[in-house]
Design a protein with these regions (language model features):
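Bacterial N-terminal signal peptides
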Residues: 8-17
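Bacterial N-terminal signal peptides that target proteins for export
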Residues: 1-8
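Sequence context surrounding c-type heme c attachment/ligation sites in exported
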Residues: 21-143
């Protein structure tokens, strides 16, 4: 009887763990990672790194790859929310970040800077799909 109880407990813990892993992260969490990674006036990031006198292309490539992953995650969340246009915008940002990572890996600064112009089109989506929340942050606009 005791063995059966232990087996049931282990199965319950495993099921809970699999369920939590499958849920993924929410959009707010993803966006809060994208902002500082891309960069803001308060928190310099990838776009400022590209403008440095001697850009660290290895770090830029790694950051752009991370940005690509985050936008792919955001695309999935927008798809779950049935927001096709926002999902398309996130997909375009993901592809642009991937192109930026690829160019940065070559070490060619001019090509890397040229690829930067396709990334960071955040305002188009934010202007249409986000609104302030009562806590001073932002939330997805009701569709």
């Amino acid at each position: 009887m005791r063995r059966v109880s232990i087996i049931i407990a282990v199965c319950a813990v495993l099921a809970l763990g699999v369920g939590l892993i499958g849920q993924g992260r929410d959009l707010d969490t993803i966006m809060k990672e994208i902002g500082p990674l891309w960069g803001t006036p308060q928190a310099p990031g990838l776009q400022q790194a590209l403008d440095a006198p001697t850009p660290d292309t290895a770090k830029i490539a790694a950051d752009a790859a991370k940005l690509q992953s985050l936008f792919t995650e955001a695309e999935g969340q927008f798809t779950k929310l049935k927001m096709a246009e926002a999902a398309g915008m996130a997909k375009a940002e993901s592809e642009a970040a991937g192109a930026l990572a690829k160019e940065a890996k070559t070490g060619k600064i001019a090509d890397t800077k040229a690829a930067k112009t396709s990334v960071g089109q955040c305002k188009a989506c934010h202007g249409k799909y986000r609104e302030p929340d009562p806590n001073g942050g932002f939330k997805v606009k009701a569709q």
